Regions:
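C-terminal non-catalytic regions of proteins with extracellular/luminal or membrane-system context
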Residues: 1-146
Length: 146
């Protein structure tokens, strides 16, 4: 075998992050909902905002997620918007009572998570927000895709 040149991991990470950012496409933007405006109050719906899927199962579960930032974490860092803290608190309380189901290993992982029911009261309360973000997700792996 010939000589191997060591790879500069950070160079490839930077390129992968650039490709991911440039690969995001907004397909539809009715009523100019995006970008969010400075001062907007945002209601975030969906338990997956709190427990996002960073990769698939099986071999995909071994993906290095050093640079992964969840949607809710990123929104919390955004200084120009405020989040509907009442709604977040409602989700946090519900999640305490309905913990994330991690399953029991290969082939015994739930393909979706239990979601909080949106009562009329919750929806009415969130109507005070300027925008809503609904986060949905389900997992997939080598033994099943959804």
């Amino acid at each position: 075998m010939g000589k191997f040149t060591p790879l500069d991991f950070e160079e490839y990470v930077a390129l992968a992050r650039q490709a991911a950012a440039e690969g995001c496409v907004l397909l539809k933007n009715d009523n100019e909902a995006l970008p969010l405006r400075k001062g907007d109050k945002v209601a975030v719906f969906g338990r997956i905002a709190f427990h996002y899927y960073k990769s698939g199962l099986g071999s995909g579960g071994l993906v290095n997620t050093k640079y992964v930032v969840g949607i809710l974490d990123a929104l919390k860092e955004e200084k120009d918007i405020t989040l509907d803290e009442n709604l977040l608190g409602t989700y946090e309380k519900w999640i305490e009572e309905n913990p994330y189901d991690e399953g029991q290993g290969w082939g015994k992982v739930p393909w979706s998570q239990k979601e909080m029911e949106l009562t009329d009261e919750i929806v009415e309360s969130a109507k005070g927000a300027d925008a809503a973000i609904v986060v949905v997700g389900r997992t997939a792996g080598e033994d099943q895709d959804n």
